[in-house]
Structures are given as C-alpha cells and as structure tokens.
C-alpha cells in the first residue's frame, strides 16, 4: 500500500512538491518533461488570449471552443514573480539582449550587449509585454522549464516559443496569475 512518488503530484494546497524550492529543484533536471499539448479550457478569456499561471509554471494560449494550447514555462524566482495584465507590444525573431541596469547591478559579469543567436538567453523569439522589461521569450536553457528561475520574464523552450510566436499578434492580451 506504499504511496509512490508519482502519486504525490496531485494539485493539493498543502503538497510541497507542487510549487516552491522542492518543485524547482525537481523540475530543473527534466528535459522538456512538459510537452506542449491542446487541453480543455474552461476560462472566460477570449480566443487569442495568453494566460500564464506562475504557480503551475504553465502558459495557455486560448484557442476557443473550450480549448487552449498548454506550454511548460519557467517563471520569476522568489522576489521576481509578478501578476497582472499586459499586452504584447512588440515581437522579435532572434532578439538582441541588453541586460537591464538592475540585473547588471546583481551580475556585473554579464555582457552589456549580446547579439541574437543560439547563445543568447532570450532564445529564438521574444514577445515584449507592455512598456515593462518583461518578455515571453525562448531560452538556451530548456532544462529550466517548470522552474521559478528567471528575473520575471516568462521563458519557454525555443521550439515552443516559435510555435506561440507564430500564433500571437501585437496587441494580444497577456494575463499573468499566481
């Protein structure tokens, strides 16, 4: 009657494996263990809306007809997570990266500029959110999907961000929930 680890993953409020440092530690070692898939959607959001659940480490692109595409994502680590509503104000393929001043203060070893490419932390695509420094972007660290490790951006595998990028238009509503 032993309860195996696999049975502990249910979405219950008191389960330490659902979120937090333990979940981050366990999820960081999985290689794309969060496959993109079409799932049932019961929310009231209109088709074309992006909904991010930081607690689930998932991004949903609402298709309509009671369906959404679900992606695994990396989210802001403790002290860097946020919630609210933004819209996609710009899209870029293989974006250049300029770390913000706050990040450079924490990490003076970072380059001041990095051209777009496979080594760039923004990955293959970026969708800029409002006038903030936040983005939904690809990543050259796919092993971080499912973890809270970023400085507030929503990161995706490059394969998934290309798929989402092709679906999204400038002006798309983005809702981020905890």
What are these regions (language model features)?
Residues 33-35, 143-152:
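Short, basic/aromatic beta-hairpin or loop at an interaction surface
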Residues 1, 15-31:
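Short N-terminal segments immediately surrounding and downstream of signal-peptide cleavage
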Residues 24-139:
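Gly/Pro-biased beta-strand-loop elements
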Residues 71, 138, 145-147, 165-166:
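Short histidine-centered beta-strand/loop micro-motifs
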Residues 81-83, 151, 169-171:
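Short edge beta-strand segments in beta-sheet-rich domains
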Residues 1-13:
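Sec/Tat signal peptide C-region and signal peptidase I cleavage site
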Residues 113, 154, 159-178:
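N-terminal targeting pre-sequences for secretion and organelle import
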